[in-house]
Amino acid sequence: MIFKGVREGKPYPEHHLSYRDWSRIPPRQIRLDELVTTTKVLALDRLLSEDSTFYGDLFPHAVKWKNVLYLEDGLHRAVRAALRNRTVLHARLLDLDDLDAVTRRA
């Protein structure tokens, strides 16, 4: 299996990050087999489109919550990487576990 899991919907709380907020998070390598998708449907035209990265962020968005990595945005990029026999993906990772720990200490 390419991903750790496939589900529909986000199990984590809403984070309210804008695209500008996401752009401040540096991308890092994430293994595809550590990701759980938050959508079951992939638009084939987005997967096959050469200019699919023209709009939006170049890097997928992932959210860590309760020690699980969820792929929030960029499923087509992750599948494209898998089709090219890549096991890792560069993505921006929002760690809600870290934010929760900081909030509890404050």
Task: Show where each model-derived region lies.
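A short, basic-hydrophobic beta/loop patch
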Residues: 55-106
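Hydrophobic transmembrane signal anchors and adjacent membrane-proximal interface regions, especially
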Residues: 3-4, 14, 27-30, 42, ...
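N-terminal leader/domain-start detector
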Residues: 1-19
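Short alpha-helix boundary/capping and kink motifs at helix termini
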Residues: 14-70, 82
